[in-house]
Amino acid sequence: MKRTFQPSNLVRKRRHGFRARMATKAGRKILNARRARGRKSLSA
């Protein structure tokens, strides 16, 4: 059977990248939460 995780850097960036996060209000909320928490990496 086909595995569920088929890695693709392009899809990864488009779906979870910084620009994708900044594009929506909810995404900006995620980034702010990760900043507040002191995450080293904010997004993919």
Curated annotation (Swiss-Prot):
Gene Ontology BP term (one): translation
Domain of life (superkingdom): Bacteria
UniProt GO molecular function: structural constituent of ribosome
A Pfam entry, by short name: Ribosomal_L34
Keyword tags: Ribonucleoprotein, Ribosomal protein
Gene3D superfamilies: 1.10.287.3980
Gene Ontology annotations for the cellular component aspect, listed alphabetically: ribonucleoprotein complex; ribosome
Matching InterPro entries: Ribosomal_bL34 (IPR000271), Ribosomal_bL34_CS (IPR020939)
Keyword Ribonucleoprotein recorded: yes
PROSITE patterns, per the entry: RIBOSOMAL_L34
HAMAP family hit by this protein: Ribosomal_bL34 (MF_00391)
Entry similarity comment: Belongs to the bacterial ribosomal protein bL34 family.
UniProt-recorded name of the protein: Large ribosomal subunit protein bL34
Lineage of producing organism: Bacteria, Pseudomonadati, Pseudomonadota, Alphaproteobacteria, Rhodobacterales
Gene (UniProt): rpmH
